[in-house]
């Protein structure tokens, strides 16, 4: 008889604790110090980061956070907490939250599950498409947490779910709901968070996952390549990142006759600064200034019922397939 108790740890990237320059600086410092994210020589990168990038970017980014901040706090944290609550209710088992950077820490999430008697932990990084910059960074934090622990709990870590049928179904449903509310646009653009092209050249499978997700979503929606496409946003620095860039794609669509655009970001499980400000506001401005007439931002899956059902299915399959 198996008397082991299973718990679930949902993990996302993280967020500043407040929309202030100080809080944003602290968060960005931790995030951009991770070699999984920026692998530049430390003797070059650290002085550049602390002497130039953080002093300039932190106040600017803080103002952007202020524009999307919710009454309950950071959107990413608010939606992540709702996901935890909904998944816990659906599974009737302990579910905790951890962030790779910032609060709540992955460490505190694991400790919470252990305090509830969990000796088996299923770790679900909320990154549908695997990347060294996201999923692998979660693994690093887990390994760091247990570096000096004599007896490890049983871990199962979800690698990706870019082609999970319920994930694709949830994405398609969110697009259809947008069509019902706002009308159907001429084109659906799937905008994924970008990573340096060099990472993919060195073996990261992120781009392949993004392409497959887009392909499956197109099939689910019954759209042709003339009606749906993909691009990459949030480029940072001068290095070449995955292309096509979202900003350049938006400039090219209207001149091709696409005047009404629906835009979605399948790589984000919860709405955050990159979706609520960059995708919803900045990208809209680019499209409209380039000749577009209608721009519809489709929110992330957040705590949508189908999204929670997908998480529950992933967890349940790991429990009952053992």
From Swiss-Prot:
Alphabetical keyword list: Cytoplasm, Heme biosynthesis, Iron, Lyase, Metal-binding, Porphyrin biosynthesis
Gene3D superfamilies, alphabetized: 3.40.50.1400
Entry's Gene Ontology molecular function annotations: ferrochelatase activity; metal ion binding
Coiled coil feature spans: none
Reaction catalysed by this enzyme: heme b + 2 H(+) = protoporphyrin IX + Fe(2+)
Enzyme class: lyase
InterPro entries for the chain: Ferrochelatase, Ferrochelatase_AS, Ferrochelatase_C, Ferrochelatase_N
Pfam families (alphabetical): Ferrochelatase
The EC number(s) this enzyme carries: 4.98.1.1
Residues holding Fe cation: 193, 274
Annotated metabolic or biological route of this protein: Porphyrin-containing compound metabolism; protoheme biosynthesis; protoheme from protoporphyrin-IX: step 1/1
GO BP annotations, alphabetical order: heme biosynthetic process
Subcellular localization, as worded in the UniProt entry: Cytoplasm
Record's GO cellular component terms: cytoplasm
Family: Belongs to the ferrochelatase family.
Known role: Catalyzes the ferrous insertion into protoporphyrin IX.
HAMAP family: Ferrochelatase (MF_00323)
Protein name in UniProt: Ferrochelatase
């Amino acid at each position: 008889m198996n008397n082991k108790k299973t718990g679930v740890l949902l993990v996302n990237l993280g967020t500043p604790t407040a929309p202030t320059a100080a809080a944003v600086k602290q968060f960005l410092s931790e995030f951009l110090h991770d070699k999984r994210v920026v692998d530049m020589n430390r003797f070059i990168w650290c002085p550049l980061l602390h002497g130039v990038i953080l002093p300039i970017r932190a106040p600017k980014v803080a103002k952007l956070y202020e524009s999307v901040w919710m009454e309950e706090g950071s959107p990413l944290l608010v939606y992540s907490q709702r996901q935890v609550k909904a998944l816990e209710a659906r599974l009737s088992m302990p579910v905790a939250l951890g962030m790779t950077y910032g609060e709540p820490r992955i460490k505190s999430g694991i400790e919470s599950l252990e305090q509830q008697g969990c000796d088996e932990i299923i770790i679900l990084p909320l990154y549908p498409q695997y990347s060294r910059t996201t999923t692998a960074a979660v693994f690093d934090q887990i390994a760091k947490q247990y570096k000096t622990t004599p007896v490890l709990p049983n871990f199962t870590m979800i690698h990706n779910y870019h082609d999970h049928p319920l994930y694709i179904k949830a994405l398609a449903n969110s697009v259809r709901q947008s069509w019902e509310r706002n009308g159907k646009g001429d084109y659906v653009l799937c905008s994924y968070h970008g990573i340096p092209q060099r990472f993919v050249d060195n073996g990261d499978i992120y781009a392949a996952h993004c392409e497959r997700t887009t392909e499956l979503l197109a099939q689910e929606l019954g759209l042709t390549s003339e009606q749906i496409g993909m691009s990459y946003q949030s480029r940072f620095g001068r290095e070449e990142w995955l292309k096509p860039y979202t900003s350049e794609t938006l400039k090219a669509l209207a001149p091709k006759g696409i005047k009404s655009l629906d835009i979605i970001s399948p790589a984000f499980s919860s709405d955050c600064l990159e979706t609520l400000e960059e995708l919803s506001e900045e990208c809209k401005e680019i499209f409209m200034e380039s000749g577009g007439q209608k721009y519809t931002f489709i929110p992330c899956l957040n705590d949508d019922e189908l999204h929670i059902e997908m998480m529950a299915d992933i967890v349940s399959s790991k429990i009952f397939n053992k």
